[in-house]
UniProtKB/Swiss-Prot annotation:
SMART domains: S4 (SM00363). Belongs to the class-I aminoacyl-tRNA synthetase family. TyrS type 1 subfamily. InterPro entries: aa-tRNA-synth_I_CS, aa-tRNA-synth_Ic, Rossmann-like_a/b/a_fold, S4_RNA-bd, S4_RNA-bd_sf, SYY-like_C, Tyr-tRNA-ligase, Tyr-tRNA-ligase_bac-type. This is Tyrosine--tRNA ligase. Homodimer. It is found in: Cytoplasm.
């Protein structure tokens, strides 16, 4: 079996790594227990998490043992990484609900049967810490001067970094130490924005336990223009089908830029390398065939083969002018809601997050109702717009929603 390190390297996952030669040898010789942390700050995982779970799946298939660490404790503080403002504080109840939602989604990627993987929650050890003992045992190993040079803190210094958030690095380092003590975990992985936090944990274990510990970060999922992947005019792309329908999920990947096809096939599917190279090198319009394969494969991983096939058929029916709308995201509307402007309707039924987004879409000629382009943001949506009790909204070229009257 190929060394999983070489697989991750070839597919373009690895961004930074500590002790590179040791890690490659370790992953080729021994079964390693590793972890990735996920702070439950929302009630669903999103595309950014998807890449990390693909890494976990590759690692598990190679015989290594994953720990999915839910940040029930660290979410009470909020990670300042990549944020220009302090995160909204969540209640314990919200965090617990979100953690429960995450657990269901992890099982699609990771096999937890027969102790092949572990799901842990750092609330188990963080919530009852003795503060003085924590400072004496952990705080003594952290240099404030060094912490302030970390990119995650630099970005916040101008606007103000709270002491609450400043503790996040210590707590993430302590997580690694605790997982090392409890489960023999020696390897932490995460997005490249977590490099400083990961290094902190590696150094803590090496200083305090005098044991080997390692860290690796992955490429962040960005588009060819450098912007983060996974955002649309309707908001984030979620892995929960109640928040982002399988059809919308499929369409997102079907519509990626030509320049991003190869990266997405490498990072977000299990297709063999020769097939990835063949698809990503298709010339001109033929690259659309690669996008269809990408959309199908990614949707299959997240939502299963049946949902992927239904989304594919719905997209093809709409593209060819067919009339089968059964698999298009459908919203039921109370008749009493009619008579409002199209802008208000789009926001009320959660197709778009704000009226300004709706007006911008109309201004850019990106909205149609039943095939007719909408040019007036004050257009009143009435029963006359419904054909056989249905109204079809299209955003952009290929994002559809069906509205039916209850």
């Amino acid at each position: 079996m190929a060394n999983v390190y070489d697989i991750l390297l070839e597919r373009g996952y690895i961004k930074q790594i500590t002790h590179e030669d040791e890690v490659r040898e370790l992953l080729g010789k021994e079964k390693v227990t590793f972890y990735i942390g996920f702070d439950p700050t929302a009630d669903s995982l999103h595309i950014g998490h998807f890449l990390q779970m693909m890494v976990m799946s590759h690692m598990q298939k190679a015989g290594h043992k994953p720990i999915a660490l839910l940040g029930g404790g660290t979410a009470m503080i909020g990670d300042p990484t990549g944020k220009t403002d302090m995160r909204k504080m969540l209640s314990r109840e919200q965090i617990q609900h979100n953690a429960d939602c995450f657990k269901k989604q992890f099982s699609k990627f990771i096999d937890f049967e027969d102790e092949k993987a572990i799901m842990a929650n750092n609330a188990d050890w963080l919530m009852n810490l003795n503060y003085v003992n924590f400072l004496r045992e952990i705080g003594v190993h952290f240099s404030v001067n060094k912490m302030l040079t970390a990119e995650c803190f630099k970005q916040r210094m101008e606007k103000g970094l709270t002491f609450l958030e400043f503790n996040y690095m210590l707590m993430q380092g302590y997580d690694f130490l605790e997982l090392n003590r409890r489960y023999g975990c020696t390897f932490q992985m995460g997005g490249d924005d977590q490099w400083a936090n990961i290094i902190a944990g590696v150094n803590l274990i090496r200083k305090k336990e005098r044991k080997p510990a390692f860290g690796m970060t992955f490429t962040l999922l960005t588009k060819s223009d450098g912007k983060k992947m996974g955002k649309t005019e309707g908001g984030a792309i979620w892995l929960d089908k109640e928040k982002t329908s399988p059809y919308d999920f499929y369409q997102y990947w079907r519509n990626v830029d030509d320049a991003d096809v190869e990266k997405c096939l490498l990072l977000l599917t299990f297709l063999p390398m020769d097939e990835v190279k063949r698809l990503s090198s298709l010339p001109g319009e033929k690259i659309n065939e690669a996008k269809k394969v990408l959309a199908y494969e990614v949707t299959k991983i997240i939502h299963g083969e049946k949902e992927a096939q239904m989304a594919k058929e719905a997209a093809e029916a709409l593209f060819s002018g067919g009339e089968s709308l059964n698999n298009v995201p459908t919203i039921e509307l109370d008749e009493s809601s009619l008579g409002c402007s199209v802008v208000e309707l789009l926001v009320d039924i959660h197709i778009l997050p704000s009226k300004s987004e709706a007006r911008r879409l109309i201004k850019q000629n990106g909205l149609t109702i039943n095939g007719e382009k909408v040019t007036d943001s004050e257009l009143k949506v009435t029963k006359d717009h419904f054909k056989n009790g249905e109204l079809l909204i299209r955003r952009g070229k290929k994002n559809y929603n069906r509205i039916i009257i209850k």
